[in-house]
A protein has these predicted regions:
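Non-heme Fe(II) oxygenase catalytic core, chiefly the N-lobe of the double-stranded beta-helix
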Residues: 2-252, 258-286
Length: 286
């Protein structure tokens, strides 16, 4: 996994599987063409890229995200009043539940799932709260030829219903809490995506199922789907597919939702944390 830089930015891989930290760039300032091209290529190469010691306004974060495409206003999770594209993910000290716990790809229940998520850290705990990532291209490559052949052409059904109707989720609807949900018909939708997709830029194949939002296979019953899905959920999050990002104040992290799963660790109950997420709209997966 190697990327040839066109500009003066530095790239340090986080693991053999995926992930890199990028230095030599101030995201509060307009990016030069060569800098942005390097960042785009690094995202495609490493799947998740982090930037340290950034001092960003909300508008800075939006401006950076807009370089990658149009921005999402989430149909369920309420955005900030002044910046509806930004979700403020605030977890006060003493709060047991956390947002984004469990392996998933953001918004795989959309007909056109998110291209990427961009998260900026304002307040972080002194320890804990790391985010894990898993490379779904490598997960596909590690499968036997026999199961690859079986998965070709298989369609998975994705749904937000289980995740957004759990007891902890129901408390967030129309609430004044740190994270609040809107009521949306999208929760009732069942969306089809191929189990094996191709990255629209690199053309590499990747697995596209996740334990949070993948419900069953098309033309299979839930019971029939369960054994294969359980295998895939375990396989796609194996340790050798992972990297780990430790948050610091001023960190910004972007990941490619099409070929990377992530999971937030909820191991900092006694501390505050505030992150801001912007999500770039994607296209239909094939």
């Amino acid at each position: 996994m190697e990327h040839q830089s066109l500009s003066n930015i530095g790239i340090t891989p986080l693991s053999n599987a995926l992930g890199a930290e990028i230095d030599g760039v101030d995201l509060s300032q307009p990016l030069e063409k060569a800098q942005f091209e390097d960042i785009q290529k690094a995202l495609c190469t490493y799947g998740a890229i982090g930037f340290r010691n950034q001092k960003l306004s909300h508008q800075n974060q939006i401006d950076f995200a807009l370089r990658f495409g149009t921005l999402e206003v989430h149909p369920i999770v309420k955005g900030m009043e002044e910046y509806p594209e930004i979700i403020r993910m605030h977890k006060p000290a003493g709060t047991p539940a956390s947002f984004g716990v469990g392996w998933h790809s953001d918004n795989s229940f959309f007909d056109k799932p998110s291209l990427g998520s961009i998260v900026y850290a304002e307040t972080v705990p002194p320890v804990g709260g790391d985010t894990l990532f898993a490379n779904q291209q490598l997960a596909y490559d590690m499968l036997s030829n026999g199961i690859k052949e079986m998965l070709e052409g298989l369609i998975a059904i994705h749904s937000a219903k289980d995740a957004y109707t759990s007891p902890s989720a129901l408390e967030k609807y129309d609430s004044d809490g740190p994270i609040s949900y809107n009521r949306s018909d999208i929760i009732e939708d069942f969306i089809e995506h191929p189990v094996v997709i191709r990255h629209p830029v690199t053309g590499k194949k990747a697995l596209y199922v996740n334990a949070m939002f993948t419900h069953h296979f098309k033309d299979w019953t839930v019971e029939e789907s369960k054994p294969l899905l359980e295998f895939l959920f375990a396989h796609t999050t194996r340790e050798e597919l992972q990297c780990r990002f430790k948050w610091e104040k001023g960190s910004l992290l972007m990941w490619d939702n099409r070929v990377v799963q992530h999971a937030a660790l909820n191991d900092y109950v006694e501390y505050d944390r505030t992150l801001y997420r912007v999500t770039v709209n994607g296209t239909k997966l094939i």
